[in-house]
Amino acid sequence: MNKKILETLEFDKVKALFEPHLLTEQGLEQLRQLAPTAKADKIKQAFAEMKEMQALFVEQPHFTILSTKEIAGVCKRLEMGADLNIEEFLLLKRVLLASRELQNFYTNLENVSLEELALWFEKLHDFPQLQGNLQAFNDAGFIENFASEELARIRRKIHDSESQVRDVLQDLLKQKAQLLTEGIVASRNGRQVLPVKNTYRNKIAGVVHDISASGNTVYIEPREVVKLSEEIASLRADERYEMLRILQEISERVRPHAAEIANDAWIIGHLDLIRAKVRFIQERQAVVPQLSENQEIQLLHVCHPLVKNAVANDVYFGQDLTAIVITGPNTGGKTIMLKTLGLTQVMAQSGLPILADKGSRVGIFEEIFADIGDEQSIEQSLSTFSSHMTNIVDILGKVNQHSLLLLDELGAGTDPQEGAALAMAILEDLRLRQIKTMATTHYPELKAYGIETAFVQNASMEFDTATLRPTYRFMQGVPGRSNAFEIAKRLGLSEVIVGDASQQIDQDNDVNRIIEQLEEQTLESRKRLDNIREVEQENLKMNRALKKLYNELNREKETELNKAREQAAEIVDMALSESDQILKNLHSKSQLKPHEIIEAKAKLKKLAPEKVDLSKNKVLQKAKKKRAPKVGDDIVVLSYGQRGTLTSQLKDGRWEAQVGLIKMTLEEKEFDLVQAQQEKPVKKKQVNVVKRTSGRGPQARLDLRGKRYEEAMNELDTFIDQALLNNMAQVDIIHGIGTGVIREGVTKYLQRNKHVKSFGYAPQNAGGSGATIVTFKG
């Protein structure tokens, strides 16, 4: 898009509004490079990124990014083979740290579905080894001792030598106190010296490094520390050499990853920019607009971002509408309306949020052109009219159906009659070429053009005749009218003069009366619309609050359920462990006394959960009422425990059901829906175990035929427990064939029971698939 429109609309000032929300220099650079695009996929991506970041902020309102400096130049130097200094390494260290924090944040992020942002988070690289290498550089700007063993050794020796120097000097301070001007150790030329009185300079052997301005003090490095100081100087040289070697070595390690680190820095900046956009949305109540596919524009309560206390207006530029002509006097806000439309489009096509209400839509234009303000050139000696016309001629040669055109005071600066005619001719040319145009003018002739011409619409800026001030409200569909008579009358002009003037333009008065009626209708519609918007805003706030509360309740519910599951698992584990111990004790005894059996049964009973009476539970009763049977439902006949399907309902309310090969007529109380079986309260029945003797030891048989499914499963559970208590090796379970429901339940139960060694169907002469023989572990 041409740079001139960005300058005219002051787009750089708009971008500056986002700067306070940025945390990184990379994000700042990307913001400054931001420009509008006509590529729909890029705009959609930017909109999707903002929406996902908004969702992220709902779950993580304090999401932040570590501040980083620009490292493009640093990475370029690395790629060129240069070695980095400590300050440059610290910049890289900061970027790697920011990258790692973002990766950790993304890994731990929950309850947010990301697509576009996920791509950026997942593209960040992980450099654990490099991060370890860069720990050698302290944030204060020095290399740590642990950077290398040699550096640590050199610094230990320096420390020891410096300690010796201090000890020697402290001794001399005490011994030669009368020879010194003051009792301190001074420093000159990087050497530790004593401030000796000039009269005693020959009393202390050493090297003179300085003399005070008065000549009374001579700074002498005692001979006892000269050798130590020279050793320290040599060690300092070794230290500098080792630090250079470390810088070179780490530069070589980082060099192969320079491009990846630079890319990570760009991603960090991009995420920072998206974050800044959302912070702007929160601060200014901005929105992410919808994207129109046909250049349709619908802006709801749109504001100019650079105007303080700007009045919000609605603008609708339909698909078929080619021109909106804003008529009326100056100083009413017409130019601001032009800029608001243009700037909103530029912001949206740059991937920025707009200052409007939810539901706003923007189009996509390849170019936006504008002729706004007095751009005459003094050097070219052009008049206002010539300047505007030169610009318009240039624009008319460039615009096409994919352009948006903004024209301020079209035809101004020349004879009104000729200017109006020229303005209409230009608008007609643009209309025929189907170029969307918004134009302002104070020529009344263009009102008629807007009314009579298809696909052209009048508009105006509201003027309050009571206060004699513009309200800056945009009234689309209502042409502007001159308020000269009302203003003159309120300012004190004679009513006679005003009356004479009004009689001379009776025809215009008729038009003004029509316009006045339109204004009143528009104002009434606007009031109703404002009320609707207030209700919508309240609903949105309530919806957000309810959604937040719902999410919090869900999280709390899940937390409580997890706790309950853990507690239940612990109880079950404890119960199983205790029951195993009881059974183990029973198995270890060859003969059991009656009272021991009773005690063991009592212990096992204590392990069973307490019964809960659900018959009075209103929630379950209500749920049961809701589950009305219908044709096609699977049922279980209570008297037989057989499974069937409802085929029809008789007039008397009874049901016909197909149970296997048998057709039955049942009342609703005689069957249960299959899906409700799990909800019925468990009823435990006493099961009698019939012992019989054989060569293999005691055996027992349980007959489940004719039982309901739940009843059969409860009896089976009790039967197996008693069989284990009686130390039986094998039992028979008769379940019949039927629909196979009970047989399947028996099989699943035996598969779960860890005391069962094996099980299988009985021989054909003993019941076949209608009975199961169970063998227990010894």
UniProtKB/Swiss-Prot annotation:
Keywords in alphabetical order: ATP-binding, DNA-binding, Endonuclease, Hydrolase, Nuclease, Nucleotide-binding, RNA-binding, rRNA-binding
GO biological process, one term: rescue of stalled ribosome
GO molecular function: ATP binding; ATP hydrolysis activity; ATP-dependent DNA damage sensor activity; endonuclease activity; mismatched DNA binding; ribosomal large subunit binding; rRNA binding
Enzyme's top EC category: hydrolase
Ranges of residues in domain Smr: 702-777
Residues reported in the UniProt entry to bind ATP: 328-335
SUPFAM superfamilies: DNA repair protein MutS, domain III (SSF48334), P-loop containing nucleoside triphosphate hydrolases (SSF52540), SMR domain-like (SSF160443)
EC number: 3.1.-.-, 3.6.4.-
Subunit structure: Homodimer. Binds to stalled ribosomes, contacting rRNA.
UniProt cross-references to PANTHER family, sorted A to Z: OS10G0509000 PROTEIN-RELATED, SMR DOMAIN-CONTAINING PROTEIN
HAMAP family: MutS2
Function: Endonuclease that is involved in the suppression of homologous recombination and thus may have a key role in the control of bacterial genetic diversity. Acts as a ribosome collision sensor, splitting the ribosome into its 2 subunits. Detects stalled/collided 70S ribosomes which it binds and splits by an ATP-hydrolysis driven conformational change. Acts upstream of the ribosome quality control system (RQC), a ribosome-associated complex that mediates the extraction of incompletely synthesized nascent chains from stalled ribosomes and their subsequent degradation. Probably generates substrates for RQC.
Protein name: Endonuclease MutS2
